[in-house]
Amino acid sequence: MAIFSTAQPLSLPRHPNFSNPNQPTTNNERSRHISLIERCVSLRQLKQTHGHMIRTGTFSDPYSASKLFAMAALSSFASLEYARKVFDEIPKPNSFAWNTLIRAYASGPDPVLSIWAFLDMVSESQCYPNKYTFPFLIKAAAEVSSLSLGQSLHGMAVKSAVGSDVFVANSLIHCYFSCGDLDSACKVFTTIKEKDVVSWNSMINGFVQKGSPDKALELFKKMESEDVKASHVTMVGVLSACAKIRNLEFGRQVCSYIEENRVNVNLTLANAMLDMYTKCGSIEDAKRLFDAMEEKDNVTWTTMLDGYAISEDYEAAREVLNSMPQKDIVAWNALISAYEQNGKPNEALIVFHELQLQKNMKLNQITLVSTLSACAQVGALELGRWIHSYIKKHGIRMNFHVTSALIHMYSKCGDLEKSREVFNSVEKRDVFVWSAMIGGLAMHGCGNEAVDMFYKMQEANVKPNGVTFTNVFCACSHTGLVDEAESLFHQMESNYGIVPEEKHYACIVDVLGRSGYLEKAVKFIEAMPIPPSTSVWGALLGACKIHANLNLAEMACTRLLELEPRNDGAHVLLSNIYAKLGKWENVSELRKHMRVTGLKKEPGCSSIEIDGMIHEFLSGDNAHPMSEKVYGKLHEVMEKLKSNGYEPEISQVLQIIEEEEMKEQSLNLHSEKLAICYGLISTEAPKVIRVIKNLRVCGDCHSVAKLISQLYDREIIVRDRYRFHHFRNGQCSCNDFW
């Protein structure tokens, strides 16, 4: 039977010493009140006990008071505010009470308060810090990622002769890893004379969390060689390391180790095993484990969903989501993210719309970032705007990820001004926010502004990363800033400590080639310290198409196909160069080779968003419900353009077509023309027509878009594979340099 009733106030007997609370507490009285404290199951009961202790004088006993305070500070119903009041009533808090206060603050919402409590302890009491004090202070330093504070506490622990204590040392290892100082963590680990399993776990999990999974596995091997018995925490860390580096063989060995050594397999460890199998691509092993698990939580279901998504079995992933006993936002996010990251943005948006129909399901930052990325890919500006409004309406914090995603979405959907507005609205910007804005400027051909922003970023004491440089080089490429790109490239390692990767080399080749410096681009490739990749040769091949350099094109294509024989893009590019030069026999031969080998040219596809719906058009497409009206508008537009001096650029026809009239008809069927015409019949001025194309816009379509913008007084924005084109009053923002 319960001692306390949760419904009724606690009934305590009148104490005979009520009139004299300062009378010394007997052992029986102390034991009785400590028993009462330990039986409390609510804050209300604890406060009743507190009041009785004050009335009876028991609270003046430091030991009893400290026990009451510990329950107020650390129990499941703890209240830091109440605990502090209890602490302040203790006449002379002992070391246990001070350490309890420090521990409570270190585990609370504001860990820095534990440091202030520590300072009060050393300045206001006769108590000295001991081996129980420092672990929680060091934990607070780790929580706020303050390396300097951690180092200071380390020094104080050494001076207090507890620096080598295993509990203190383990806390220091965790703190140094949390602050990114791996070397100091390793030094502390080596100084521990009698390492316990927590010491090893702290190192293994620290390496995993800080991106050194290989070191984690090496340390586990050493741990095993020293006959240290691993715990389930060890196994979780090791399996996470295997998952990160996709080491299925080692992961399976770990699973065997768990079975052979009878390691306790709780739900956390089972989920780690499942995660390892899915991340390593062994969906069969994952399915067997999943089916065998008697206990499952949402992490289990979401991990399995992720596994199917990784293996591109989206039907099975959907089935897992539908079968979940309780679908949470994490599961929905997993499916949206899986589609978005694997080139299926339309499917990601479909899932997002399903999520919107769910009751009591609150969107979080992860949901919004993934969905904004999908919007960016397909050009869903209206949905992106809705998400931005949702963020404002619901007070969702604009962290760096959300800010970057918004900037990226607006930029890729053609609204650069809105990107600037979002960028300027935030005071704190990290490297990803700066890089997103630089990338947006690059896509829209604002090369000089992008380079200026690169330097402003450094003035703001934000160090660029590899993505930043990629975006700056793209900006230079679209604006012809060759000298600036070369200068920044040579500064990457010397000034910024960033070793150029293959994508950076490809960017410089693109900068040189696009500006006509083909021979210089070849010499640059020959001087590369790493083997040229397909992206490098692809950049050179693309430049050869622009400048019709057949000899270099054939060489670049040969090198590219040596690395990736089934690269359809390389075949198409070379075929287009042959066609541009009138070498139709070569075109025929290359197209025949593609048919025989099963290679297919990616069809031209353009999309346009009208009233929140994405409408797609393929070249020569008749599938759209309004195709008849679209083609009627196309005929009207082309006739109007011809009457104003337009002549089709039949040199842009890259198929083998004999009759001039058929060549002209072929040009008219390009997907971007269809999308623009649909925009003309579906919207009215001054609404901007925004079109997204998957391939490079051809010269004829470029000329047509300029003329339409002039003759119909419409602003047209086209995003092709490489950049944006803003058509206004018969002119394009690219100045015909693309």
Curated annotation (Swiss-Prot):
What PROSITE patterns does the annotation carry? PPR (PS51375)
Q: Which domain of life is it from?
A: Eukaryota
Q: Mainly resides where? A: plastid
Q: Looking at the record, which segments are called Type DYW motif? A: 643-738
> Could you tell me which InterPro entries the record lists for this protein?
DYW_dom (IPR032867), E_motif (IPR046848), Pentatricopeptide_rpt (IPR002885), PPR_At4g14850-like_plant (IPR046960), TPR-like_helical_dom_sf (IPR011990)
Pinpoint the residue ranges of every PPR repeat in the record: 94-129, 130-164, 165-195, 196-230, 231-265, 266-296, 297-331, 332-363, 364-398, 399-429, 430-464, 465-495, 501-531
Q: Where is this region: Type E(+) motif?
A: 612-642
Name assigned to this protein: Pentatricopeptide repeat-containing protein At2g29760, chloroplastic
Question: What is the gene name?
Answer: PCMP-H33
